[in-house]
């Protein structure tokens, strides 16, 4: 090793797995608070499942001939016991697994919601990441179209609560298993007539999962997909009644929708209702929420036959929309930044900061960055940059007199002028600050 210190290489995060920095966290917190309030209003309960599950859960639940299972899962073998494990690419299968394992449905249906990171090994691009976050709902034990309509209505309420516009609803019905089987026969016959122009993905799916060919993103295959036999034409009376019942409920609640016969979703567990909320404001990644009915899944994963429906939405995509439409709320600063000069003042200021926190105020106490006392000027700069409404100042004079200086940093305070310092007795400091903040809020409402 040379005399000169060897340069230590900086480590970067994994591509497609992003840090959420403090300047962005406020928007996440705003969205999370808004959606949690909505979920409570609909009687949903939070469930939290592990990030890692047995790989078999997803191959059996999602379907082996799907993009997620074939190409996108982060799977590995546990070195301790040889188990095949996967970082969850979605969470419906995990919630259903938990409901079965813990016998959650023994006393009736459940409304559950989750939020957290998912993982898919795909090419990172705008709105599509290797680690991404979803919030979702699962209504377990509800069979009627009213449950489908309710979860769709929840999405519309969320867009309204967030102030988002231009998100459009598309719906379809995948019918029942026997109806899909009859459609599959005709669809394969049709696709075989065009096999020469099918791309490799379509050829691979032709006999394993032909329905997914209709969802192709290949521009060269759009006309073929458009003219293919439509599953909706194969629906029996029961499926048709369910789909028409959903449409009536949506219309009764003034929810506009488009029937998209090519909407099939990328997961094998869906039946009957499927839907997507789409926008043209995010480029190619236009789907912000999607879901539907998955009545066969609970039985497929070892439970008793139980109807179910749900949705998931990509949080990153919704936050992109909030920024795009300039709906991101301003970051709120703390209430108070405590400044001090001198050892005795530091101790008094530290005690005062804790007493202010006791009353529920948000307080930053100035701590030295390098162990040396900072100048009054630099501390006040920090106070202003923090977004605090007030600076509370302790110096030798304040300590000697049992007082504190208070400066309004945001035009608040009894004098109504920014940076007008007032002297306040320490015992009356909390009351003074609360009254000043109330007065400032009232002025802001005028």
UniProtKB/Swiss-Prot annotation:
Compartments where found: Cytoplasm
Any one biological process term the GO annotation gives: histidyl-tRNA aminoacylation
CDD domains: HisRS-like_core, HisRS_anticodon
Enzyme class: ligase
Cross-referenced SUPFAM superfamilies: Class II aaRS ABD-related, Class II aaRS and biotin synthetases
GO molecular function, one term: histidine-tRNA ligase activity
EC number(s) per entry: 6.1.1.21
Subunit structure and binding partners: Homodimer.
UniProt-recorded name of the protein: Histidine--tRNA ligase
Native species: Burkholderia vietnamiensis (strain G4 / LMG 22486) (Burkholderia cepacia (strain R1808))
Gene: hisS
